[in-house]
C-alpha cells in the first residue's frame, strides 16, 4: 500500500497500518494482485476514494460492505479522517477479522450489516461509502432507501461500481480470462458472454441490455456477479432517491466511462419533503 502514502501524504502514521492492511483478504487479491493491471486498477480506485473523501465533510462515516477494512484504514490515517468510521459486513468472520487486524486503530469500528437496523444508526452518518457492492445486489432499491435512512440530513452517499459496458467490458473479460489461467483470485469462475451478449454490452446505453445471472448461496440468499451490470441503470436508481452531485472515473479520472474501470457517483440526501414527493 505504498501508493497510499505517496498520494495522500499520511507519512509516518501510514507505516503503522502496513502489516494490517497487507494481510487483508481483498488487499492481497486486489491492490497487491500478481496481475499488475488488476493491482493498478484497484490502487487507482482506492486513491480516487481517498481523494473524493476530501470533498465529503462529516464526523461519522459508514463503509457499507467494507470488505477487509482497507479503505477505512487508509481514510482514518489520511488528511480527511472522520472522528468515527464504521465498517459493516455480512458475516461474523469478516467482522471479527477486521476487528482483530485494526484493534489498535482509534475511531474504527466494525459491525454486522444487520446491526444497522438498530435505532442508534438511523440518521447517524454524515457520509456513506458503498464501493463495489451494489453491482452484486439483486434489488438495489431497498438498500438505497436504507442508505437514505442511515444518513443525517444533508449527508453524502459515495458509490463506486465497475464499468461493465462499452470497451471496458471487452478488455476486462480478456484480463479476467488471463488471470483465471494464471490462477489469480476468483477469476477462474468468471461468467462468460455469448457474442451477442458482448455486442449488446459494448453498445449498452441507459437501459438494461442483457439478462443478469442470479446466483444462489448455500444459505438461500441471492446475488449477481458482474455480468450484465450497467452503471447507468444504477445511476438512475440513485437519482430517484438522492440529489446527484457529480460523477468521476477511476483508476484515472480523465479516462471517463468510455475507457475507465470504475464509475463513481456522489449524491446527497434529499430533504424529507422532497423525498416524500419523489416517492409519491
Q: Each predicted region: which residue ranges?
A:
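S-adenosyl-L-methionine-dependent methyltransferase catalytic module, highlighting the catalytic core
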Residues: 15-44, 93, 114-117, 138-152, ...
Amino acid at each position: 500500500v505504498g501508493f497510499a502514502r505517496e498520494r495522500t501524504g499520511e507519512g509516518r502514521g501510514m507505516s503503522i497500518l502496513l502489516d494490517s492492511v497487507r494481510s487483508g483478504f481483498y488487499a492481497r487479491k486486489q491492490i497487491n494482485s500478481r496481475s499488475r493491471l488488476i493491482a493498478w486498477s484497484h490502487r487507482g480506485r482506492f486513491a480516487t476514494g481517498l481523494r473524493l473523501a476530501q470533498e465529503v465533510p462529516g464526523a461519522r462515516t459508514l463503509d457499507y460492505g467494507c470488505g477487509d477494512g482497507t479503505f477505512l484504514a487508509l481514510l482514518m490515517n489520511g488528511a480527511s479522517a472522520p472522528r468515527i468510521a464504521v465498517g459493516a459486513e455480512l458475516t461474523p468472520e469478516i467482522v471479527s477479522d477486521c476487528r482483530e487486524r485494526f484493534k489498535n486503530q482509534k475511531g474504527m469500528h466494525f459491525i454486522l450489516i444487520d446491526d444497522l437496523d438498530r435505532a442508534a444508526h438511523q440518521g447517524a452518518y454524515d457520509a456513506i461509502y458503498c464501493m463495489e457492492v451494489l453491482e452484486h445486489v439483486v434489488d438495489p432499491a431497498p438498500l438505497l432507501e436504507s442508505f437514505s435512512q442511515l444518513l443525517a440530513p444533508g449527508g453524502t452517499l459515495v458509490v463506486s461500481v465497475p464499468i461493465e459496458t462499452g470497451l471496458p467490458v471487452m478488455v476486462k473479460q480478456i484480463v479476467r480470462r488471463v488471470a483465471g489461467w494464471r490462477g489469480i483470485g476468483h477469476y477462474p469462475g468468471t461468467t462468460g458472454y455469448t457474442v451477442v451478449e458482448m455486442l449488446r454490452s459494448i453498445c449498452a446505453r441507459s437501459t438494461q441490455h442483457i439478462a443478469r445471472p442470479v446466483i444462489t448461496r448455500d444459505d438461500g440468499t441471492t446475488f449477481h456477479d458482474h455480468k450484465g451490470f450497467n452503471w447507468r441503470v444504477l445511476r438512475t436508481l440513485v437519482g430517484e432517491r438522492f440529489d446527484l452531485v457529480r460523477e468521476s472515473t477511476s483508476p484515472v479520472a480523465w479516462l471517463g466511462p468510455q475507457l475507465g474501470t470504475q464509475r463513481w457517483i456522489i449524491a446527497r440526501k434529499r430533504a424529507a419533503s422532497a423525498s416524500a414527493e419523489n416517492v409519491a
